[in-house]
Amino acid sequence: MSKINHQPSEAELEILQILWDDQPLTVREIHEIISQTKNVGYTTVLKQMQRMEAEKGLLIRYKEGKVHYYSAAIQKSDVQTSSLNRFVNAVFNGSTSDLIMHALGNQTTSKEELEELEKWLKEQKGKL
C-alpha cells in the first residue's frame, strides 16, 4: 500500500471516482459526467484537474496528439484505507470495534450480512 500524501477533497474524490471507473479520460469527458449532476464550468474542472496533477500528484497526464488524457495516480483502495483510518482515529478514537458496533447499531442488518461478518471475523482470527 502506498502512502497517501494528500487527502483528496470532496471535489477531487468526485474526479478520482470517475477515473477509477473508466480511465484514461479527457477533461471534457470528465466535465460531461460531472455536469449530469451539478452545474460546474469546464474551466473549473480543468483547473481542479491541473492542480490535482501538478501540485498534489493525484493525477497523471499524458498527451496523445493534441489530446491530454488523465488517469488516477493513486489507487482507490489506498484512498479508502487512508480516509477510513483518519475517520476512525478522529471520530472513534482509533477503535475499529466501536465503529463497527455503531454502524451495525444504526442500520438494519440482514441475516446474510451478519453471516458474512461472522465469516470475515473467523478469517481474521485465523490470521493471528
Can you name each region flagged by the protein language model?
Residues 18-23, 36:
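Short helix-capping/hinge SLiMs at alpha-helix to coil transitions
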Residues 82-125:
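Amphipathic alpha-helical dimerization/coiled-coil segments
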Residues 25-33:
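Short acidic, hydrophobic short linear motifs in intrinsically disordered regions
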Residues 46-50:
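Short, hydrophobic-biased segments on the C-terminal half of alpha helices
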Residues 32-40:
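Short helix-coil junctions and helix-kink-helix linkers
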Residues 5-9, 63-82:
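Short, cationic-aromatic polyanion-contact patches
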Residues 1-16, 78, 127:
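Short alpha-helical segments that sit at the start of domains
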